[in-house]
Design a protein with these regions (language model features):
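RNase H-like, metal-dependent nuclease domains and their acidic two-metal-ion catalytic environment used
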Residues: 1-83, 105-159
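Conserved phosphate-binding/catalytic loops in two-lobed NTP-binding clefts
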Residues: 79-93
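Short, surface-exposed amphipathic charged segments that create phosphate/polyanion-binding patches used
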Residues: 92-103, 120-123
């Protein structure tokens, strides 16, 4: 579960994006849930608690910063990890593009807000919002990190 936090209920503000993804033994990434809502801190915290109960993620990544600290306090006891923006959003998306290019990303059709994520991907980087794209990239990168090494697609090819 990866979270790109925002706390504003204004229509023009970025929502808090949440993406749940899983990885199979063949290196396929499955996007299972997408959330993108303008909630208060407490409403977002409750939603994250529900996602934790539903999906039991090994880790819950929250983009670091002031809002990340607020959520970390609110969600103490959950398997939280801080996510750092180590490059601009376009570079981060490019870092996982090989999984799209090789057909290793699957979007579950009944996943919440999957069409909204698709629309953001098609409009990126010129769309009004990119929060779901960023959360998805974080989710994929969290799945592929083994210690400090980013695992490559080749590591999943079975002989």
């Amino acid at each position: 579960l990866a979270i790109d936090p925002a706390v504003s209920q204004r229509d023009t503000a970025d929502p808090t994006a949440k993406v749940v993804a899983s990885l199979d033994q063949f290196g396929n990434v499955f996007v299972r849930y997408v959330g993108n809502d303008r909630f208060s801190v407490s409403e977002n915290g409750a939603g994250i608690q529900r996602l934790n109960a539903r999906f039991s993620p090994e880790r819950i990544g929250i983009e670091e910063g002031a809002l990340g600290l607020v959520f970390k306090d609110l969600l103490a006891g959950l398997p939280l990890v801080g996510l750092k923006a180590n490059a601009d959003k376009t570079s981060r998306l490019i870092s996982v593009s090989r999984f799209f290019e090789s057909g290793k990303i699957y979007f579950l059709q009944n996943a919440n807000k999957i069409q909204d994520l698709h629309d953001q991907l098609m409009e990126f980087p010129n769309g009004a919002h990119d929060d779901m794209v960023d959360a998805m990239v974080y989710a994929i990168r969290m799945l592929l990190v083994d210690g400090q090494k980013l695992v490559s697609a080749d590591d999943f090819i079975l002989d």
